Amino acid sequence: PIAGSMVLAAILLKLGGYGIIRIMQIMPMTKTDMFLPFLVLALWGAILANLTCLQQTDLKSLIAYSSISHMGLVVAAIIIQTPWGLSGAMALMIAHGFTSSALFCLANTTYERTHTRILILTRGFHNILPMATTWWLLTNLMNIATPPTMNFTSELLIMSTLFNWCPTTIILLGMSMLITASYSLHMFLSTQMGYPLLNNQTEPTHTREHLLMILHIVPLMMISMKPELVI
């Protein structure tokens, strides 16, 4: 069920990050060097999750692994125990909660019309559902963390924190962001461009689907313009 996937990616997955924040508050502040292996493991896990996204042929699996990769950045930012790192982690959890939930919603709208989640069979929706293509473009741009979205603000905070703590981590972080951009563009081009391979009759996008996307994107844009609401 798509509702379960949306709740899992938007809320339940972020509860793990909240738990790590609470646990780190009772850890000694001066011994951050001992967390270096965990930090490298979190960033390496994010890269592996991103590489797994590039190999996916199932649209829903791709979005699910995308959520996992972003949580790697959240864990790395929390481990350092700085105010900027904590703010960036909280902002990224909120921003990606909206983004991943919106992506799952869009994947379901595609599935309802094609009855398949295979990327190669869901192409050509740009010609059939142009408004849905606009939603796909906006959510993928948020997933890539393009300015002025909240995803960009949070990843900039995390990048600054990691670079100030250990400049070498920028290599792993840069690789992760590059692969994120690659699979997000791959997902958009695979589902929207090209010629449709299925000949079944496609329903137009319904008002409830547009409303659902507005309820995801508008709050995220509002928080992006006024991040003091959450940071």
Curated annotation (Swiss-Prot):
Its EC number(s): 7.1.1.2
Predominant cellular place of this UniProt entry's protein: mitochondrion
Reaction(s) catalysed by this chain, per the record, are:
a ubiquinone + NADH + 5 H(+)(in) = a ubiquinol + NAD(+) + 4 H(+)(out)
Give the EC class as a word.
translocase
Example of a GO MF term: ubiquinone binding
Report the source organism. Answer: Trimeresurus cantori
Q: Does the keyword Translocase apply?
A: yes
- Alphabetized Pfam families for the sequence: Proton_antipo_M (PF00361)
This one is known as NADH-ubiquinone oxidoreductase chain 4
